[in-house]
């Protein structure tokens, strides 16, 4: 049963108060599984559904609504982040993941630094760095070869390349 449908009949309904909430168990599971499969394709869709559940909680009573005003706004902003955080915890050992939400969330403030020591990537195994068999000082340093004969680029093409106006 969706949070904004109600089969109960109530005689007095106060529309001005926050009676429903997006942070209901059903909507939490919905956002949790939707955000675990979340990508850039479903980002706009989940953001649109945030507004649906938010306004449904504001405008109508809900049999599953258990939070009031402040936690309604809290759930509205934090539900999708919690779902993405549980998805991103599986891939924290790879720093090459494209913009994980925990990194965006914790590095958004300029005064805050990302706690690298508390994530799994800090204890990831380090790969050995390949070194040359001999130090670089013993390797022959060849100078860059210079052309000594033949027409230069300006003489060959005239005032400029034919495809580039000079």
Curated annotation (Swiss-Prot):
Keywords, ordered alphabetically: Glycoprotein, Membrane, Transmembrane, Transmembrane helix
Positions of region (Disordered): 127-166
Glycosites: 7
Membrane-topology annotation of the record: Multi-pass membrane protein
Keyword Transmembrane helix assigned: yes
Recorded GO CC terms: membrane
Segments passing through the bilayer: 15-35, 41-61, 63-83
Compartments in which it is found: Membrane
Protein name: Putative transmembrane protein encoded by LINC00477
């Amino acid at each position: 049963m969706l949070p904004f449908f109600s089969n109960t009949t109530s005689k007095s309904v106060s529309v001005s108060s926050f009676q429903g909430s997006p942070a209901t168990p059903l909507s939490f599971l919905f956002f949790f599984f939707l955000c675990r499969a979340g990508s850039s394709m479903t980002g706009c869709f989940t953001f649109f559904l945030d507004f649906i559940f938010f306004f449904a909680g504001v405008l109508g009573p809900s049999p599953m609504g258990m939070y009031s005003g402040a936690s309604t706004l809290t759930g509205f902003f934090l539900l999708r982040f919690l779902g993405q955080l549980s998805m991103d915890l599986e891939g924290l050992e790879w720093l090459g993941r494209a913009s994980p939400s925990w990194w965006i969330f914790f590095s958004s403030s300029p005064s805050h630094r990302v706690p690298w020591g508390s994530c799994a990537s800090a204890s990831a195994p380090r790969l050995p760095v390949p070194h040359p068999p001999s130090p670089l000082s013993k390797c022959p340093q060849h100078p860059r070869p210079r052309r000594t004969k033949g027409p230069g680029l300006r003489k060959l093409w005239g005032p400029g390349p034919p495809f580039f106006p000079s």
